[in-house]
Amino acid sequence: QTGWLSTMYISRPKREKHSRLLRLLKMSRLTKISVLAICVACSSCAPRVATSFWKIGTEADSVRPGYTVIHAEGKTRHCYPITKWEDSADVDTYHQLHHHGVAVESELMAYRLYFDKKQTIDVYCKRTPQLELAQSYWYPNDSLLAEGYGDDILRVSGTVGVGSVKYWNGTKQVHIDAGKRCQYIADQTHHQATIGVTVNDWQVEGKSEEMAVQYTLFAGHRDMRCDVYTTHPIEGLCTGVQTIPAKGGSDTVTIILPNGILLASWGTDWPVNDTVKYGKETVGLGVFIPKAYAGMPVHDKQNNLCLLKEEKNTAHFYLTVCGATKENHPIATNATEWYDYLLKWAKKLK
């Protein structure tokens, strides 16, 4: 049984760490089920990333696997988990999905992708490093907040948020107004997870376009990688960071590096409309586009952006976030520290 355990559930670098457990198992008569139970209980083998994707239904859906009742936003929702959902543009899917789209989390950050033409990335920051969405469902109640759970930290409104893929019309960023949209969980292991969105019948630059955008989050990381795929080159694709607050924010920078372009912002704003229960959050946003995919930097009143330059109809970039007031031990407490951190982060990427 120990050979099965070490081969299937403990990677080679971890075997030395688990040698005491393996010696114990060799002397035992444990079944495979018992061995699996021990391994699951081991913290280093437990999942360190997770996804969250819920369809809002009715009590009749209680027969579905994973069905649960979620109390959020002042409502009681009968929900069941999904891995994929597709709808046409005339369906208000945004309000038919709990937390309005698919989400992914590591111990440090969680990100959700809105299921509408915005396709904006929104941010949930962890106060304590841990997986939380299986308990908070993005909207932690008072008792969870008292236990040290994180929360949403960014009001994205109609902006690019951080690392969303938008279209530059020559004067400002606009949303992806496609005929059909599909969100999905592409992949999930203990140490990484990928979520994505595809659009079809997107009328842009004189043609009907299809596009897929995937975000991958790794265990122990606050940053994500974004991969973009199109059927034909699209000159106006862009990404970037919003100003904070979305209206009136000004602390943004664009830095041309030898290996690409770094976009960043820093600021303070209320993350939600309830300004009585929730306080303002100070947040840092960053996006890095490798040189091969970095086009011309552009901006409008609410967004610091860069055009994406595709190679063989693909491009990729990276995004990251700091919750200066939310995290117990933030990596930056002011704009200068944040920009210094981003410079070191970006230099390692390609």
State each model region's role.
Residues 49-175:
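Solvent-exposed N-terminal domain segments of exported/luminal and surface proteins
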Residues 1-2, 12-50:
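Bacterial Sec-dependent N-terminal signal peptides
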Residues 84-85, 91, 283-350:
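Beta-strand-rich recognition/accessory modules
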Residues 234, 244-302:
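Accessory, usually C-terminal, subdomains that scaffold auxiliary metal cofactors
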Residues 196-198, 214-216, 227-229, 240-242, ...:
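Residue-level recognition of well-ordered beta-strand positions that form the cores
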